[in-house]
């Protein structure tokens, strides 16, 4: 069975682990990986009701509170998608859950450390380390 060593591993690709993965991009000497059993990114797909708003400020995106100059900020997402000026002109205090899900997906697509179709079968702690077992490898 193939073995891979990382300094940090995360199980799941939700907002918390996406935030950690995005912030770790600047840490060149840290080997890390995040594993999600889903085939691609999705966030609360069953809760994307029309008009549903995020209950927190868009300023609390994945990176801005820690690194406001990060290329993974919500503002960078708006610029990339050519929606910055319409967003600013609308003076939106809150954003839709659907737009935030699009932002999360945009970030997820840019993070090579996030692996999909990676179902963790077992987690063990041995010899001072955690070991994650998959069907085809151990991390």
What is each stretch, according to the model?
Residues 1-3, 25, 113, 125:
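Generic structural signal for beta-strand residues in well-ordered domains
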Residues 3-33:
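N-terminal Rossmann-like FAD-binding beta1-loop-alpha1 element of flavoenzymes
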Residues 37-99:
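Glycine-rich active-site loop/strand segments that organize a redox cofactor
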Residues 33-36, 115-117:
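A structural signal for short, well-ordered beta-strand segments and their strand-loop junctions
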Residues 74-139:
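Feature captures the FAD/FMN-dependent oxidoreductase FAD-binding
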Residues 15-16, 39-41, 121:
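Short, solvent-exposed loop/turn segments at secondary-structure junctions
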Residues 20, 44, 125:
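Short glycine-/acidic-enriched loop or helix-start segments at secondary-structure transitions
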């Amino acid at each position: 069975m193939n073995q891979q060593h990382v300094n940090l591993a995360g199980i799941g690709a939700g907002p918390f682990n996406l935030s950690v993965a995005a912030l770790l991009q600047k840490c060149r000497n840290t080997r890390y990986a995040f594993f999600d059993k889903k085939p691609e990114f999705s966030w609360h797909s069953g809760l994307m009701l029309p008009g549903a708003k995020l209950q927190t400020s868009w300023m609390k995106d994945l990176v801005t509170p820690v690194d406001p100059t990060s290329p993974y900020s919500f503002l960078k997402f708006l610029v990339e998608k050519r929606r910055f000026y319409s967003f600013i002109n609308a003076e939106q205090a809150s954003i839709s859950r659907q737009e935030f899900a699009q932002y999360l997906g945009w970030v997820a697509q840019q993070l090579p450390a996030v692996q999909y179709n990676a179902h963790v079968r077992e987690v063990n702690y041995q010899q001072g380390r955690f070991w994650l077992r998959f069907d085809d490898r151990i991390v």
